[in-house]
From Swiss-Prot:
Reactions performed catalytically: 4-CDP-2-C-methyl-D-erythritol + ATP = 4-CDP-2-C-methyl-D-erythritol 2-phosphate + ADP + H(+)
Protein name: 4-diphosphocytidyl-2-C-methyl-D-erythritol kinase
Annotated S-S bridges: none
Active site: K13, D139
Keyword RNA-binding: no
Gene3D superfamilies listed in its UniProt record: 3.30.230.10, GHMP kinase, C-terminal domain
Lineage summary: Bacteria, Pseudomonadati, Pseudomonadota, Gammaproteobacteria, Cellvibrionales
Amino acid sequence: MLQTSLTLPAPAKLNLFLHITGRRPDGYHNLQTVFQLLDFGDELTFTPNQSGEITITPAIEGVPLEQNLVYKAANILRSHVNRPELGATIHLTKRLPMGGGIGGGSSDAATTLVGLNYLWQTGVSPTTLAQLGRQLGADVPVFVEGNSAWAEGIGEQLIALDLPQYWYVVLTPACHVSTVEIFSHKDLTRDTLAITVAAFFEKGGKNDCQPLVERLFPQVRDAVDWLNKFGPAKLTGTGASVFAAFPSKDAAQKVFANKPKHLNGFVAQGVNESPLHQRLPEQCITGV
């Protein structure tokens, strides 16, 4: 018997650095990055049924249902288990900006895969769920696996990391940065030398997309310049969001309270285990 409903988090992420080490024959780029999960994000409420219909509320303006990552995630899981009668109503409470570089759509898709696998009782293993997620986007597997992680390849080769749990100020300028546009731009740095995990912990790293994004989007540059007054500011992903780390919640909130009014954002703590995995029963995570 299907559970009536369940509300689950879809946490944000930050890229603590992002090195582009080469371009592959298939057009994708080889990357090195660290995904830092946060204790803030979207929420999804799932109500499973046997109608064969996937309903998403509210509709996202300008995004057809078939292109909605939540819908695509539900559909790909249902197709994988060949259970066309499975359905669900999914209500998305959106807190993360689209096109912000903080993983909103990818995290929503991952929460949908993990949550519906549990509610539909389809018994798909976490490894297979991550593989299904990869078909939806390179960032989806880290949210399925549920740990802050070192990533290589196109971002799908993951090693869980134990990161310092800093507090972060995350600011999002009023612009949309296209990942496709940035990764296809002729001026993007694509030849950064690979580093080791130990080198990251010793010296950190940069975001190879940041100089280009700042040049193309003055709003991002201005946000970086403002946040740099309080700590080293970095772009996450291809933007548009930028962030800086602080040692305490109080320190982060003091900076955030003085942000320019035109910048949206939030304060959140870095976590090593996803809030999604903290919320779910153990058997949902292990596949037992």
